[in-house]
Design a protein with these regions (language model features):
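TPR repeat positional signature
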Residues: 19, 26-33, 52-53, 75, ...
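Residue signature of alpha-solenoid helical repeat architecture, marking inter-repeat boundaries
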Residues: 17-24, 47, 67-69, 110
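Short coil/turn linkers that connect adjacent helices within long alpha-helical scaffolds
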Residues: 16, 62-66, 103-108, 141-148
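Residue register of alpha-helical TPR repeats
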Residues: 24, 71-73, 114, 121, ...
Length: 165
């Protein structure tokens, strides 16, 4: 994305608000497909899920009141979609972009844990088990203040796909 991840847009921008609404819709649509077991998603579902994740990233990059966490989370969602589709190279590309957004904006806590989780899953998909395990350990080691957020991260760290690691 060419949008500076450090930029936050003000409220009251009608076009930005429309992008925000579309970002939410596309994000939620992506999760509807991600929530289905692999055996229940068709090839058409996978394609729609992927397009929805890219649409979410596009709209979040232009949304009113966006912050760097929106960039990181959009990249995380793309990394997860590509991991679920078993394309480790694209998953790692987006996981690295997620991590870069976190580092550039000094995001920590929940977002940093998920950047490590995305890298771990992508590396596992690529068969790079040692690196994947190190990243999964890093994800589990990130301090997360909110107990509910911590529980969500911990749950995702044990949820498949982990590609045999």
């Amino acid at each position: 994305m060419s949008v500076d991840p450090a930029v936050t847009t003000p409220a009251g921008d009608a076009e930005g608000e429309a992008h925000r609404a579309q970002g939410v819709t596309a994000n939620n649509g992506t999760w509807a497909w991600l929530s289905k077991p692999d055996s229940e998603r068709t090839a058409e579902d996978d394609e729609a899920m992927t397009l929805s994740a890219y649409a979410a990233a596009y709209h979040w990059a232009r949304a009113a009141r966006r912050g760097p966490e929106n960039t990181a989370r959009a990249e995380w969602l793309l990394a997860r979609v590509w991991a679920v589709r078993r394309n480790g190279a694209l998953a790692l590309h987006h996981a690295d972009r997620c991590m870069a957004a976190c580092v550039a904006a000094h995001l920590a806590d929940f977002d940093l844990a998920y950047a490590h989780e995305a890298r771990a899953r992508a590396l596992a998909c690529l068969g790079r088990a040692d690196e994947a395990l190190a990243e999964r350990t890093a994800a589990a080691s990130v301090p997360i203040a909110d107990p509910e957020d911590r529980s969500i991260v911990q749950g995702d760290l044990v949820a498949e796909p982990w590609f045999g690691i």
